[in-house]
A protein has these predicted regions:
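Short, extreme N-terminal segment that most often corresponds to the first beta-strand
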Residues: 1-28, 36-38
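Exposed alpha-helical structural elements
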Residues: 21, 59-63, 138, 153
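Broad structural signal for hydrophobic residues in well-ordered alpha-helices, predominantly aliphatic
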Residues: 26, 67-68, 124, 157
């Protein structure tokens, strides 16, 4: 077991429902995680750096980010710092709803990821159940610039939501 260590990245997945309701799904995963009840959500984060798979597919944070959310726990919102980039994932409600991705890199801004379905900022606002007055434009503004750190961008996103 390799406990999650500082500097290995950061990650949090927010799924609908209680931690107890998500327990079975979480036990079947390839990474060891902890779950905590939050108002309206369950927060899921890593407790070990490595997944139960062989390299190069053993990076726990990437496995957690890419893990599909069961339809009963959707919508889900993932917030990660991976390889120096801020990564936001959303899996909306719906039987075959695909996971969407937004990747922001310092000095470059939002990056195109040809192999990953893009995540419109309006979808982030809609999934999170934002407060009245928060617009998709406000969410887009978080990722408009190219300066700052990935963690700063994610914290700013949470403050907007």
């Amino acid at each position: 077991m390799t406990l999650a260590t500082p500097g290995a990245g950061h990650g949090l997945v927010l799924v609908r429902g209680s931690a107890k309701a998500s327990a079975r799904w979480l036990r079947r995963g390839l990474v060891a995680v902890a779950a905590v009840d939050l108002p309206g959500w369950t927060g899921v984060c890593l407790v070990e750096d490595r997944a139960r798979t062989k390299p190069p597919y053993d990076r726990g944070l990437e496995v957690l980010a890419a893990r599909p959310t069961p339809w009963g726990r959707r919508p889900s919102l993932g917030l990660f710092v991976v390889d120096g980039c801020a990564v936001v994932t959303v899996q909306p409600r719906g039987w075959r709803a695909e996971q969407r991705w937004l990747v922001w890199q310092p000095g470059q801004g939002v990056r195109r990821t040809p192999d990953l379905p893009p995540l419109p900022t309006g979808m982030i606002a809609g999934i999170a159940g934002v407060s009245p007055g928060v617009t998709p434009a406000a969410v887009a503004e978080v990722f408009r610039g190219t300066s700052g750190t990935p963690l700063d961008r994610l914290v700013q996103l949470l403050s907007v939501l």
